[in-house]
Amino acid sequence: MRVRKPAVAGYFYPAEKEKLIQQIDWSIKHELGPKALQMPKLGEKALGGVVPHAGYIYSGPVAAWLYSALAGYGKPDAIIIIGPNHYGIGAPVAVMKSGVWETPLGRVEVDGDLAELIMRHYKGVEDDFYAFSKEHSVEVQIPFIQYYFGDVRIVPIVVWRQTLSTSRELGKAVATAIREYGRYVYVLASSDFNHYEPHEVTVQKDDMAISKILKVDEAGLFEVASKFDISICGLGPIGALIVIAKELGFGNVTLLKHATSGDTSGYKDETVGYASILFHR
């Protein structure tokens, strides 16, 4: 059995179980956090959403918003996590179709059936364990998933070919796979927003991108990111999520929380933007 060991425990989040639980508790209770483990539902059903993936001390309070919102809809049968491939290693679009992911909170199993369905409907995705070896965009979501939902299965996907066409192809394949799977699935697009600019600039640029996401406009998102040089690391995963939402009829999008690393750290000269955005109907 393939075991994906933690790559960023002790860096992005605590490597010890109790300290990790305390860090997630801190994220929820933080002045920028949701203050509750479970939020009232916005509509009848949720698809998932956009969630940041920085170190917990920076983006944890914002990330907690999406998880607390999803907790209001209940535990899913599986969670698909689509993140960027920051290191550019492995396949252009990679999935891990078997094995487990390990964190200080224990192990979660990959849902092989759902992963196989995605691969069946998109020939551009490859089963590539190596592509995940260093990648934090998926890893940092898993302790939150374990904290909120326990032993739910996951399907990890990372993308370094972040084009509009790739997002559309992947999104349509995932939507088809979810339909055929026939059970309750959440989809997470793991992404931070604008990088390493002053707080005011990051807020302004993020707002332009978020406005396109709220309009369920993947083409507009890619266009504004290119035109205004908005350095969104998970542009492709967000684009895929928008396509999945369109295909499955989740037309309502709600911005739960937007902040920057300057809000959590106090250092506002060079910041990274974070947003939790819920897709629902």
UniProtKB/Swiss-Prot annotation:
Pfam families: Memo (PF01875). It comes from the Archaea. Coiled coil: none annotated. Belongs to the MEMO1 family. This is MEMO1 family protein Pars_0062. It comes from Pyrobaculum arsenaticum (strain DSM 13514 / JCM 11321 / PZ6).
